[in-house]
Amino acid sequence: MLYYSIVFLLIALVAGLFGFVGIAGVATGIAKILFFVFLIAFVVSLVIGRRPRV
């Protein structure tokens, strides 16, 4: 589960880099949306991964 958290974080950082720096140009809005979607997915996977297994 930690692997997926790291993957979500890296994807969010890349999407944010392209969206906020302006490299993507037209896709800036999409990159911002993807940044927040993957950032939320990262936080959720961190919380779920910390639960004790029953």
From Swiss-Prot:
GO cellular component terms, semicolon-separated: plasma membrane
InterPro entries: DUF1328 (IPR009760)
Transmembrane region(s): 6-26, 29-49
Major site of localization recorded for this protein: membrane
Keyword Membrane part of the UniProt annotation: yes
Keywords associated with the record: Cell membrane, Membrane, Transmembrane, Transmembrane helix
Compartments, record wording: Cell membrane
Pfam families referenced in this protein's UniProt entry, alphabetically: DUF1328
Membrane association type: Multi-pass membrane protein
Family, as annotated: Belongs to the UPF0391 family.
Protein name (database record): UPF0391 membrane protein Sde_0270
Phylogenetic classification of the source organism: Bacteria, Pseudomonadati, Pseudomonadota, Gammaproteobacteria, Cellvibrionales
